[in-house]
């Protein structure tokens, strides 16, 4: 968000970073949003100019005040996500890869029921992340499981719940 999420007027900001999967070198970035986009793209540009990596993004310091930024800036968060991918703490797939998944893949939408009712990806069942632990015994551990949410945080949390409960795929 352009400022702390609890602060009035907070609006979403989406950051896409491109990085070398071998060493994490930051190669490019795009940001979509409103307030503060210029500040964030300049932060990313400075890291790219000096040949920095996604690990540098996690360490960036910035001025913090709730009306203008969150304690962990969106640029820091992009670095954390990339670091999790590089270190194998999370696995991701792209939307275009969904059609290539085995037919018996378990597809779970971990958004709330109200969000799911507004629209969902065909073939995804709705198990809200807050209820996932209650349904673990219903999920086969020998099948590939793909989770989806609106932004990424709940998908990551669902992934971690599954991994911590012995799901390998």
What are these regions (language model features)?
Residues 23, 112, 131:
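Short, glycine/acidic-enriched loop or turn micro-motifs at the edges of active sites
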Residues 90-101:
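A short, well-structured juxtamembrane/interface segment
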Residues 127-128:
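Short acidic-hydrophobic, aromatic-tinged amphipathic segments that line or gate anion-handling sites
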Residues 106-111:
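Short hydrophobic beta-strand that contains or immediately precedes a catalytic carboxylate
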Residues 1-88:
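Flexible, glycine-rich terminal cap/loop adjacent to redox cofactors
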Residues 101, 116-123, 137-139, 164:
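Short loop/helix-cap segments at secondary-structure boundaries that form the rim of catalytic
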Residues 133-169:
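Catalytic cysteine-centered active loop of the rhodanese-like fold, especially the PTP/DSP P-loop
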Residues 44-45, 98, 145:
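Generic hydrophobic alpha-helical segments
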């Amino acid at each position: 968000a352009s400022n702390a999420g609890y602060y009035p007027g907070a609006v979403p900001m989406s950051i896409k970073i491109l990085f070398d999967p071998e060493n994490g070198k930051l190669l490019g970035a795009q940001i979509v949003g409103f307030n503060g986009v210029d500040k964030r793209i300049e932060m990313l540009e400075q890291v790219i100019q000096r040949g920095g990596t996604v690990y540098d993004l996690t360490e960036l310091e910035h001025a913090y005040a709730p009306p203008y930024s969150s304690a962990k800036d969106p640029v820091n968060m992009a670095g954390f996500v990339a670091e999790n991918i590089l270190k194998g703490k999370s696995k991701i797939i792209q939307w275009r890869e969904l059609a290539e998944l085995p037919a018996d893949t378990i597809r779970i939408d971990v958004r709330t029921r109200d969000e799911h009712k507004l629209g969902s990806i065909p073939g995804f069942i709705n198990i809200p992340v807050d209820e996932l632990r209650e349904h673990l015994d219903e999920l086969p551990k020998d099948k590939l499981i793909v989770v989806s949410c609106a932004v990424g945080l709940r998908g990551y949390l669902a992934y971690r719940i599954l991994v911590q409960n012995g799901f390998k795929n």
